[in-house]
Regions:
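Glycine-/small-residue-enriched transmembrane alpha-helix faces in small-molecule transporters
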Residues: 2-56, 161-191, 209-215
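Membrane-interface helix-cap regions at the ends of transmembrane helices
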Residues: 61-80, 94, 147-163, 207-243, ...
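C-terminal-most transmembrane helix of multi-pass membrane proteins
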Residues: 2-13, 58, 157, 243-245, ...
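Specific transmembrane alpha-helical segments of multi-pass solute transporters/efflux pumps
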Residues: 32-37, 66-114, 118, 154, ...
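Hydrophobic transmembrane alpha-helices of multi-pass small-molecule transport proteins
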Residues: 2-5, 65, 69, 128, ...
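Hydrophobic/aromatic residues within transmembrane alpha-helices
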Residues: 43, 53, 57, 105, ...
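Juxtamembrane helix-entry segments on the extracytoplasmic side of multipass membrane proteins
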Residues: 18-22, 47-55, 79-85, 157-178, ...
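Helix-helix packing/entry segments at the starts of transmembrane helices
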Residues: 56, 99, 113-120, 186-210, ...
């Protein structure tokens, strides 16, 4: 899952003291998120269930963030009764559903394709603001929407009878819609009467997701034996990677660290600048999956991917 499909809600950019530093931080975050897809796909290909990996990611990230917030901002540990419903929506539909559906999609689609579909979430948000909230929309947003739609059709090779796996495509669409709820509920939280900083908001979102998974898949039934093996990654030679090490990457370097870097970068960048750097994630993810997993795009699909990213970028910069 990515958290960079659009600039993080509630993170107001401070005066830009160092734009290069901001770009570097956001690029590192995008790269870590990009590698996370390949690592997660490898873990799932070696016996760890999609839902259980989602449970491990949410629970592990919650524990790490809880320890951090307890050290630096103990007041943020307090949850007021009025914010519980919104935090529940944010955590269950925004966090848990986005992660699980993205993981499901990459078990059946190329990682780059899944991310391209998920990255169209800002366009759906723009449609919601236009038709749901009746906000005016610039013509460039409609051009961007048309470009992204055409690009997705090219990536799916619809003229050849739609070559993408139907379940994988449906899961990616579901992840995209869940990501829309993630951004809208987060935005409502940080602008409403119970405002939170982005770190504690993410912590409680992960906490709500972890609680959801604990009820849906109780820990006492966890198949711990699936974490005891090793996994071979095609592009790393004959190295056998311990599954717990790869899961640790998904939790720490694939979730907590890149999110923190993204938050720090927003102290130096405007949202429009950050959105440009965020567009590198599917590009980097596709390159990593090509090298490590052998996933490839045809030249026509690459052209479609460029059209999708161009459309998203055009719409983002004209919202």
């Amino acid at each position: 899952m990515t958290d960079l499909a659009e600039p993080l809600p509630g993170v107001a950019a401070a005066p830009r003291t160092s734009a290069p530093r901001g770009y570097a931080l956001y690029l590192v975050a995008a790269s870590l998120f990009a590698l996370n897809g390949t690592v997660a796909k490898t873990v799932m290909a070696n016996g760890v269930d999609v839902w259980r990996l989602s449970q491990l990611r949410a629970t592990g990230a919650f524990v790490v963030l809880l320890a951090f917030v307890a050290l630096v901002n103990r007041r943020a540990l307090r949850v007021r009764r009025g914010e519980i419903p919104l935090l529940a929506v944010y955590g269950v539909l925004g966090v848990a559903a986005t992660q699980a559906l993205y993981f499901l999609s990459i078990t059946r689609l190329a990682i780059g394709v899944s991310l391209l579909i998920e990255f169209t979430s800002p366009l759906v948000i723009a449609l919601w603001f236009r038709f749901g909230l009746r906000h005016p929309t610039k013509p460039a947003v409609w051009v961007g929407l048309a470009m992204a739609s055409a690009g997705l059709a090219i990536v799916a090779e619809v003229w050849d009878g739609f070559t993408l796996d139907p379940l994988g495509f449906a899961a990616a669409l579901g992840a995209m819609l869940a990501l829309v709820l993630y951004f809208l509920s987060a935005d409502a939280q940080v602008r409403g009467p119970y405002r939170r900083d982005p770190i504690s908001l993410t912590m409680w979102g992960m906490g709500a997701a972890a609680l959801f998974w604990a009820v849906a898949d109780p820990w006492w039934s966890y198949p711990w034996s699936t974490l005891g093996g090793t996994a071979l990654v095609e592009g790393t030679g004959a190295v056998a990677w311990p599954i717990p090490l790869l899961v640790g990457y998904v939790v720490v370097l694939g979730t907590v660290v890149p999110f923190s870097f993204a938050v720090l970068s927003m102290r130096h960048l405007r949202a429009s600048q950050a959105s440009v750097v965020g567009m590198t994630e599917p590009i980097i993810a596709t390159g990593i999956a090509w090298v490590l997993l052998g996933e490839t795009f045809s030249p026509v699909q690459l052209a479609g991917a460029v059209l999708v990213l161009g459309g998203i970028l055009l719409a983002e910069r004209n919202r």
